[in-house]
Amino acid sequence: MADKLMDKNFEELCYSCRTGDMDNVDRLISTGVNVNSVDKFDNSPLFLASLCGHEAVVKLLLQRGAVCDRDRYEGARCIYGALTDTIRDTLLSYDISKAVDVKQPFATHISSMYNDEGFLKRDITFRVSNGKLFTAHKFLLCARSEILAEKMVNEWAKHEIVSLEVRPDIFDIFLKFLYLIPILHQIEPGQYEELIELSSKFDIELLPEFLDKARHTADPTEKSRLMSDYQYKFTEVARSQLLIFVNNCIFRSTVDLANSERRVFSLMNCPAYPDVQLMVKNRNGAIRIYPCHLAVLSRAEYFKVMFTNNFKEKVTYIKAKHVTGKYNSIIPQLTLPNCEFEVAEIILRYLYADNTDIPWMYAVDVLLLADILLEDRLKTIASTIITQSKEFIQQYNVFDVLYLSWEIGVERLEQFAAKFIAIHLQELYKDPEIKRAIMLSSQRISLRQETDTIELVDDIRYYLLRKYSFEPDDVELFENQDDLEYLKQVGYLEYRKDMGMLDNILADLELDV
C-alpha cells in the first residue's frame, strides 16, 4: 500500500514538474519521494522541469537532492534539453558535492539547533578524551539512535556529564552528522576508521556504510557523487526517525485533562525528555498536554518570536531552568490556539519531521492554525491539499474557500475559487452568494492601490478564456465571424453565454468594470 502511494506521489511530482507547480513539488518532496527516480518514459523530475522551462522548480529540486551530473546520461539530458540558457547555466554551475538538503527547511532547522546556545535548551554534556565538552539535545540523540536512547535510560540516566574515550575531532564530526550538518566533504583520510567504529558502536544508520565506501573511493568525482547520493538518504532517514520519535515518545506520553481540570503531574521520567509542555484544548473543552521541545517548536515563527522577545513564556522558561536545574519535574507550559487534537498532532509531525500528510478534512484547520503560527510553508502545503482534493470541494462551498483565501492571504486558494466559479458559472449564476462575493471583492479595491477593476471579476474572466482554451486575440477574431455553426463548434457561443451571465450579475450590482 505504501509503495502504491509513493508511486502515485512520484507520478504527481513529475506532472507538477512539467506544469511548474512549485508549491506542490515542495509538498511532494516532503512526503519522501525519491527526486532522482525516473518515470516509465525514463524522465526524471529534474529533466521534466528543465525541459519545460521552470527555473524555480529546477532550483528547488537541486536544493532537495536532485543530482545533475553531466558525465551521466540523465544529467546530460537535463543540461542539453534545458529550455532556457539560464536553466542550462544553473545546471552546469551546480556543484554536485553541494547537492544536498541543506536548504530544506527541515534539515536547516535541525542543523541550526547545533549552534543555538540560547535558553539552555541542551540537556546533556559529553566529555571526550582530551577533556573537551560537547553539549547536545537528549531527544534528538534518542531519535537518531536506539542504542543512545537505551543508554540515556540506563547507564547515563543519573550523569550530568557523560565521559567518552573518543577524539574530539571524531566526536565533533559524529555530532554534526546527527544534526544533519553537511560535513561529509570535511572528513580526512585518518578519521575514517574511528568514525566507522564510533558510528557502528551506536548503530547509526547508513553512516558506517557510507564511510566504508568513501574511504575506498579515490576519484574526486565519484566521491562527490557518493556524498550527494548518501546525503539525501541521510536526511530521509532522520525524518523517518524523528517521525517515529514523535509518534512513540511524544504522542504516547501525553496527559489528558477533563474540562477545567487542574492536577499536578510530572514529566520527569518522560521518554521524550521535554523542556516545555504544549497545552491544547479541543472544541469539547478537553485538554491534552504534549511533552515538547522549544528547540523544535521555535521552527514556527510564532514560538520563535515569543522567545526572542521578553514575553512571560521566555522569562518563565529561563527561570525554571535556573531554579530547578536540568532534571526539573516542573517544566514551563505553552498554549497552542484551540484546535482538535488531530490538528495539533499534524502540526507537531510537521515541525519535528517535516511530515506533510494532511487529511483533507483537517486541511482548513491546519491552514488557519499555520496562519496563526506564522508558518507560511505549512499554509502553502495545506492550501495545496485543499485545491487538489475532490472530496474537499464536495463538502465545502467554493465561496467559503474564497473568503478563507481573503482572510489569510493565500493567493492559490483565491485562484482556485475563481477558476471553480468560472467552470461552474452556469450552475452558480442564480446563487445569491456569487453577487455577494463580487461585491465584497469590489470593496477590497482600496486595499489594492485604488484600481477600477475588481480582482475576482478579472480572475473569472481570465479562467473563462482558459475554460474554452481561448486567447484574447481569438475572441476579437470570433466577434467578426458570422458562421454560427463554426462559432458553436469552437465553443465561442458558450463562452459568450458565460460572459453574458457575468455581465448581467455586474449590471444587477450596478458595477461598471
UniProtKB/Swiss-Prot annotation:
PROSITE patterns (alphabetical): ANK_REP_REGION, ANK_REPEAT, BTB
Residues passing through the membrane, by range: none
InterPro entries: ABTB1 (IPR044515), Ankyrin_rpt (IPR002110), Ankyrin_rpt-contain_sf (IPR036770), BTB/POZ_dom (IPR000210), SKP1/BTB/POZ_sf (IPR011333)
Renumbered ranges of ANK repeats: 8-37, 41-70
CDD domains: BACK_ABTB1_BPOZ, BTB2_POZ_ABTB1_BPOZ1, BTB_POZ_ZBTB_KLHL-like
Repeat among keywords: yes
One annotated Gene Ontology cellular component of this protein: ubiquitin ligase complex
Domain spans labelled BTB: 122-179, 274-360
Keyword field: ANK repeat, Repeat
Additional observations: Present with 195 molecules/cell in log phase SD medium.
Protein name: Ankyrin repeat-containing protein YIL001W
Organism: Saccharomyces cerevisiae (strain ATCC 204508 / S288c)
